């Protein structure tokens, strides 16, 4: 007897496009829980700099896949895929519809398309050596080892740069050539969110981020885990760290973070258009358009 595939709803879009707010409204309407697919929100204490759903928002709607690990841990896409798939299957076993929200294209596609990279365990000695080299030299190495990947990830993304070098040094092959696909047995509805005023939204969010605590948040992380944490080299935290060290003025930190975030958002948009091809929601009535598409998928 034919068994229809279970539905999994996905909302993707660039950073600062309003995924969290829209996602919560959708979740309320359909009585859904939310699975956050974000490469930084899965770490504890990184709240302001990652625009993590607030405690109030988490009380309104149950959120999964956030605050899972210490910032000193390094979870790769393969590990996240395994954690997320278990979380999704738990919901499916309860006859609920999983709802995934995120802007991390690599992590999202590892889940919904079944892409996975070689399962190379963390190499502590190698990682330590790469961290001592610094991101600039590691990036130059990566351009030699895996030029394909350097066109897909942010040059300031130390976590993914080191992971890619780690895989290359262990296997002798670039990570971009070792990805395989094993699609999960789900029916995927992909909704895309993009705002025409995204640059203005990014500037406003970055300004608020610095005004409302990313510097204090960064200080606390440094005090507990040290200043060499790879996650502190990601957008926002790197600039906050430079303010703390008095290497940057606050205004310049906001400017640099805004520019980096706009560049990152452009790459996200390109990724989603090329790799995902979602149903892009109508900006004039996002919630209504999302509801119509979800109801259609539920028929």
From Swiss-Prot:
InterPro entries: Dimethylallyltransferase, IPT, P-loop_NTPase
Keyword line: ATP-binding, Magnesium, Nucleotide-binding, Transferase, tRNA processing
Site (Interaction with substrate tRNA): 104
Stretches for region Interaction with substrate tRNA: 38-41
Record PANTHER family: TRNA DIMETHYLALLYLTRANSFERASE (PTHR11088:SF60)
The protein's role, per its UniProt record: Catalyzes the transfer of a dimethylallyl group onto the adenine at position 37 in tRNAs that read codons beginning with uridine, leading to the formation of N6-(dimethylallyl)adenosine (i(6)A).
Protein name: tRNA dimethylallyltransferase
Organism: Prochlorococcus marinus subsp. pastoris (strain CCMP1986 / NIES-2087 / MED4)
């Amino acid at each position: 007897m034919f068994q229809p595939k279970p539905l999994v709803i996905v909302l993707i879009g660039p950073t600062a496009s309003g995924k969290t707010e829209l996602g919560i409204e959708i979740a309320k309407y359909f009585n859904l829980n939310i699975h956050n697919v974000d490469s930084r929100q899965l770490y504890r204490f990184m709240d302001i700099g990652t625009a993590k759903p607030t405690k109030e928002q988490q009380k309104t709607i149950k959120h999964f896949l956030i605050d899972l690990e210490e910032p000193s841990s390094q979870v790769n896409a393969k590990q996240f895929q395994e954690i997320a798939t278990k979380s999704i299957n738990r919901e499916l076993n309860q006859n609920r519809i999983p709802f995934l929200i995120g802007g991390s294209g690599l992590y999202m596609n590892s889940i919904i398309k079944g892409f996975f990279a070689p399962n190379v365990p963390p190499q502590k000695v190698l990682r330590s050596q790469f961290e001592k080299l610094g991101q600039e030299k590691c990036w130059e190495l990566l351009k030699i080892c895996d030029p394909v990947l350097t066109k897909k990830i942010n040059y300031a993304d130390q976590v993914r740069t080191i992971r890619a070098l780690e895989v290359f040094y262990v296997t002798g092959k670039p990570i971009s050539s070792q990805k395989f696909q094993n699609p999960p047995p789900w029916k995927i509805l992909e909704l895309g969110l993009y705002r025409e005023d995204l640059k203005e939204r990014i500037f406003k969010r970055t300004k608020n981020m610095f005004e409302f605590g990313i510097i204090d948040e960064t200080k606390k992380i440094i005090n507990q885990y040290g200043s060499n944490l790879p996650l502190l080299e990601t957008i926002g935290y790197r600039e906050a760290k430079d303010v703390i060290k008095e290497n940057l003025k606050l205004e310049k930190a906001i400017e640099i973070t805004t520019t980096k975030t706009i560049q990152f958002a452009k790459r996200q948009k390109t990724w989603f258009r090329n790799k995902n091809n979602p149903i892009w929601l109508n900006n004039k009535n996002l919630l209504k358009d999302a509801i119509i598409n979800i109801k259609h998928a539920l028929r």
